[in-house]
A protein has these predicted regions:
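Structured, active/binding-site neighborhoods that engage oxygen-rich ligands
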Residues: 1-358
Length: 358
């Protein structure tokens, strides 16, 4: 295997890909207990952390500081808070990375949207899909073909589901964001349209660019080139970049963008991309700061933490991710994807490296 970019030795590529997997899983686990944007606002998340004496946040969420806080957490919290983690929790944000790897191993980079749908039916349980993916799955079972699978009776076409499936296309195209975006688009149109598809293209390009970018801003700039400049997604990413450049602090930036995207809902691609962008910019390449700011930003916390963690993990590499994030994962993934439950994270990374640049 020859690394795609001349800047990446095989050792560096392997470290960065493993960093992407570890970062995605750790970021997902960090955000999972508070994944419900209409309940867990930025203010409430920080109130939880203050009551638990956990600000600044430098590790997984602490156990709930009160009965009132505990009752609002997702039921999986007991396996996702510090001191209780033994391997990853099962989550769709990780399932789709696993399934995407299997798609590329099975069909290669020339896979079709129809082949992606066939693998869903073969490998992914219907009740472990949500929102746009569940609508598309139902449409597949009823005999519809893409792109009708995305458009028929699917009110979630611009939600974040396609974005969370995109990382593997970046990991396998290091330093080549446009190619990563092309593969992500082919996958995304199974279930999404418009900004839902652009979100997947943007995320894949962002991850791919992180392999050779010197800083998060460079990766963000590269990712913007693969989506329409007039799209609402591109406009909100540029807006966050502009607010960051104007020296607003992180809280002020998110408050401004929250007001400007009001009404889209907490699972829509656009406001979540703003939270991810802010986490990356204000995290400034530091893994811990990036994932904690992103999750504290609220909305779809586990998805946002996963994507920001993937980008930050690629930027710094696995060796530079602090041990408090990686050791509790015990190199093990729980997955609903048939045949993959209990697979080692290091094994997933090794198989991803084998596909890089193909």
């Amino acid at each position: 295997m020859t690394p795609t970019s001349p800047q990446l030795t095989e050792h560096v590529l392997a470290d960065r890909v493993l960093g992407g997997w570890l970062g995605r899983i750790a970021g997902n686990m960090l955000g999972k207990p508070v994944e419900q944007g209409e309940v867990w606002t930025r203010e409430r998340i920080d109130r939880y952390l203050r009551q638990a004496e956990a600000l600044p946040l430098t590790d997984y969420l602490p156990e709930p500081p009160s009965r009132e806080m505990e009752s609002a957490l997702r039921s999986e919290w007991r396996a996702c808070v510090r001191g209780r983690i033994h391997g990853s929790c099962r989550d769709d944000d990780v399932d789709y990375a696993v399934l995407g790897l299997h798609l590329l191993e099975t069909h290669g980079s020339a896979f079709t949207t129809e082949q992606a749908g066939e693998l869903w039916l073969l490998r992914l349980p219907y009740l472990q899909t949500f929102t746009a993916e569940r609508a598309a799955y139902r449409n597949l079972v009823n005999g519809l073909k893409p792109p009708l699978t995305a458009t028929y009776d699917n009110p979630c076409q611009e939600w974040i589901g396609a974005l969370i499936r995109a990382d593997v296309f970046g990991w396998t195209n290091p330093g080549v964001p446009r190619r990563a975006a092309s593969l992500a688009r082919r996958d995304a149109v199974l279930s999404h349209t418009g900004n839902g598809v652009y979100g997947a293209m943007w995320a894949a390009a962002l991850v791919a660019a992180a392999f050779t970018a010197r800083a998060p801003r460079a990766a963000l700039d590269a990712a913007l080139t693969v989506i329409p400049a007039s799209s609402r997604l591109a406009r909100v990413v540029r807006r966050v970049i502009s607010l960051h450049e104007s020296r607003l602090n992180w809280e002020e930036t998110l408050a401004t963008v929250e007001e400007e995207t009001a009404g889209l809902g907490w699972i829509h691609t656009v406001p979540n991309a703003a939270v991810i962008t802010a986490g990356l910019l204000y995290g400034d390449g530091d893994f811990t700061r990036t994932v904690t700011l992103t999750v504290r930003g609220g909305l779809d916390t586990d998805s946002n933490g996963a994507t920001a963690g993937s980008v930050a993990g690629v930027l710094c590499g696995a060796d530079a991710i602090p041990a408090q994030w990686t050791e509790p994962l015990e190199d093990r993934v729980r997955s609903a994807v048939f045949g993959f439950d209990g697979v080692r994270i290091s094994e997933l990374a090794r198989r991803t490296v084998e596909l890089a640049g193909r």
